[in-house]
């Protein structure tokens, strides 16, 4: 992919992704070995619940696969009225490859009966998954102890601490550093929160919608043995208290905002912002004068030195596919060092462990030059919880709501967690009653 094309692609690609072990090998997975019938024309259908724009579909899927496998024709099956995945299953028209978002999709597709263990395909095609980040690979598993692999990660999201250099310069405070913990950032936020020249500046903000569901302590929401909520715990109290205190700083509580990103990106009134990938909107912000940089996401002083759990996009080869080998070759190529490097260069963190690929992160994004963007891919992601269930997305939504009641409405943490547990259990029962 030439540099001009990469630059054109990165903005559209970054917007798209923000709205979403076999062996012990080397840097990246070995691609599927060529088969005897490699030149036999075949059509592979692909389903993405969020749908691709024509531009992204052609650039992220069609062109790289056509270049590698000219005999393979890809068809994008759109998620529309009458062609939802459930509709396609009912009509016996399940696509060959299905894309999904994290463990939620694994549970959903498993319930639809369309998943199949991919390890035989991996073995038959000489695919070595040893170069894939094991945390990302495990994040798609219903049971980490199960050797079966139903989906492979193709992309992942992390988070970092972005900061406004101009504000730190203005108030004579030292910049944040890599490797800080939340206690240190809290003290820094207190120094930065103030009113100056009639303008109210906040020291810190974060996006609870990511920080809570993908929490750094790998806390479970629901007990997978009982299907009962498990959030009245010391761990959840620690997370709520650690993040809520930032909103107790005088002048640092904005209340519920219609857009939590604008104060940092546009208004330039937030000194530090802990958030997943915002490199795409930072293009415009940089053009409008925002002098920013980033450091690694702060960690808990008494806990593991990990970032948030990775927000993983997975690829699944359906059980009913009549062209499993060719479908798998498509998946394997998208996980290759070549494609993962191209995507890393336009700002998508690679699912491969290879240091050279990590170092290439955002290299083709001109507005990142001279900035510490390697921090975004330098931390260690938190593993998924020991207990995962199909109800975790429901529970995560309720926990975010309760955290905001604590942060913005002054609700007691113990009360909020008790109420969350009651609501989650009620919603689990409602889901079960639908069966």
Region spans (language model):
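Hinge/lid segment of periplasmic solute-binding proteins
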Residues: 104-158, 293-295, 365
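Short helix-initiation/N-cap motifs at beta->coil->alpha
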Residues: 77-85, 180-187, 253-266
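Glycine-centered hinge/linker elements that transmit conformational signals in sensory
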Residues: 188-189, 226-256
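Mature extracytoplasmic/periplasmic domains
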Residues: 281, 317-393
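Aromatic-glycine-rich donor-binding/catalytic loop that engages nucleotide-sugar donors
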Residues: 166-177
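Short glycine- and hydrophobic/aromatic-rich loop-to-beta-strand nucleating segment
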Residues: 159-163, 315-316
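Conserved N-terminal structural module of periplasmic/extracytoplasmic solute-binding proteins
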Residues: 2-112, 127-129, 175, 254, ...
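Extracytoplasmic/periplasmic substrate-binding proteins
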Residues: 47, 208-212, 241-326
């Amino acid at each position: 992919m030439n540099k001009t094309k990469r630059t054109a692609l990165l903005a559209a690609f970054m917007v798209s992704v923000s709205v979403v072990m076999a062996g012990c090998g080397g840097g990246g997975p070995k691609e599927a070995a060529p088969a005897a019938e490699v030149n036999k024309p075949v059509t592979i259908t692909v389903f993405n619940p969020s749908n691709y724009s024509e531009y992204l579909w052609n650039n992220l899927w069609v062109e790289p696969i056509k270049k590698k496998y000219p005999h393979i024709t890809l068809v994008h099956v759109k998620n529309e009225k009458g062609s939802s995945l459930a509709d396609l299953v009912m009509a016996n028209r399940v696509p060959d490859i299905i894309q999904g978002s994290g463990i939620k999709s694994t549970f959903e597709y498993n319930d639809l009966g369309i998943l199949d263990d991919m390890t035989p395909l991996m073995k038959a095609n000489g695919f070595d998954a040893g170069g894939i980040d094991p945390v990302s690979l495990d994040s798609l598993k219903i049971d980490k102890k199960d050797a079966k692999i139903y989906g492979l990660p193709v992309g992942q999201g992390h988070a970092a601490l972005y900061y406004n250099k101009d504000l730190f310069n203005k108030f004579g405070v030292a910049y944040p550093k890599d490797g800080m913990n939340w206690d240190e950032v809290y003290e820094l936020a207190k120094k930065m929160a103030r009113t100056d020249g009639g303008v109210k500046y906040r020291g810190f903000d974060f996006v609870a919608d990511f920080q809570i569901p993908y929490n750094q302590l790998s806390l479970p929401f629901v007990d997978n043995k009982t299907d009962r909520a498990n959030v009245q715990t010391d761990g959840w109290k620690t997370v709520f208290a650690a993040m809520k205190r930032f909103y107790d700083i005088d002048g640092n509580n904005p209340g519920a905002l219609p857009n939590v990103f604008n104060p940092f990106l546009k208004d330039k009134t937030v000194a530090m912002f802990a958030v997943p990938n915002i490199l795409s909107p930072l293009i415009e912000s940089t053009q409008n004068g925002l002098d920013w940089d980033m450091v690694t996401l702060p960690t808990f002083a008494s806990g593991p030195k990990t970032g948030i759990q990775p927000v993983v996009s997975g690829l699944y080869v359906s059980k009913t596919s009549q062209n499993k080998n060719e479908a798998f070759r498509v998946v394997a190529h998208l996980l290759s060092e070549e494609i993962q490097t191209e995507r890393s260069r336009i700002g998508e963190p690679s699912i491969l462990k290879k240091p050279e690929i990590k170092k290439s992160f955002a290299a083709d994004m001109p507005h990142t030059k001279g900035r510490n963007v390697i921090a975004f891919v330098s931390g260690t992601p938190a593993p998924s919880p020991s207990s995962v269930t199909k109800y975790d997305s429901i529970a995560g939504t309720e926990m975010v709501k309760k955290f905001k009641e604590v942060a913005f409405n002054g609700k007691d943490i113990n009360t909020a967690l008790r109420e969350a547990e009651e609501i989650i259990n009620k919603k689990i029962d409602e889901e079960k009653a639908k069966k």
